[in-house]
Regions:
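Residue at a conserved register position within TPR or TPR-like alpha-solenoid repeats
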Residues: 28-31
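A domain-start/cap signature at the N-terminus of enzymes
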Residues: 46-101, 155
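Structural register within alpha-helical repeat arrays
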Residues: 23-24
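Serine-hydrolase catalytic machinery in alpha/beta-hydrolase-like enzymes
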Residues: 101-168
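Alpha-helical solenoid repeat scaffolds, predominantly canonical TPR units
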Residues: 5-6, 40
Length: 169
């Protein structure tokens, strides 16, 4: 199963992100491995201090553990951390000045951040291209963000684009 594959290869990962933990507890739950699902969820939220958007806990993949007290504890702890993170979130753009003749603005994907985005886009940097990164203020889970068309995404992008002195390019 996908769950077994992930567990058998977990040691190959540099670290276990909140997204990987989400895969682990969802796949365990859908594989009817309730104790393992709850164990991964507790490891993520209680031990590692991770958190998720409240919608994550509504995922139908988690239906068979939703009534468990341990699930409820993790869900509540996560929500408290999420609400706290909402107070401090902001759009991040790495551009500060012109360094090359051409500018590339890279957006991260959903459930990513600028560091992850750099892994995908830094290959464009050379003597002609300056690559800068924009990270959304819309939080997804611990250190991961998302872009929402119906959220503040368009306004964030407009603000960043207007903050760059395009006359330099």
């Amino acid at each position: 199963t996908a769950y077994d594959f992930l567990v058998n290869n977990i040691d190959d990962l540099e670290s276990i992100s909140s997204q990987v933990y989400n895969f682990l507890y969802c796949l365990a739950a859908t594989s009817n491995k309730k104790e393992e699902a709850l164990g991964w969820l507790e490891e993520a939220v209680i031990i590692e201090g991770l958190w998720y958007r409240p919608e994550v806990f509504e995922d139908e993949d988690l239906d068979n553990i939703r009534e468990e007290k341990r699930f409820e504890i993790c869900s509540k702890k996560s929500e408290v951390r999420y609400l706290e993170a909402l107070k401090n979130t902001k759009t991040v753009c790495t551009w500060t000045e012109k360094k090359k003749d051409r500018l590339v603005l890279a957006l991260h994907g959903n459930q990513q951040n600028n560091d992850i985005s750099k892994n995908y886009w830094s290959f464009l940097e050379d003597d002609k291209y300056q690559v800068e990164y924009i990270q959304s203020e819309e939080i997804d889970s611990y250190r991961l963000f998302r872009w929402e068309d119906k959220g503040s995404g368009p306004d964030q992008l407009n603000e960043v684009i207007n903050s760059i002195d395009w006359n330099l390019y």
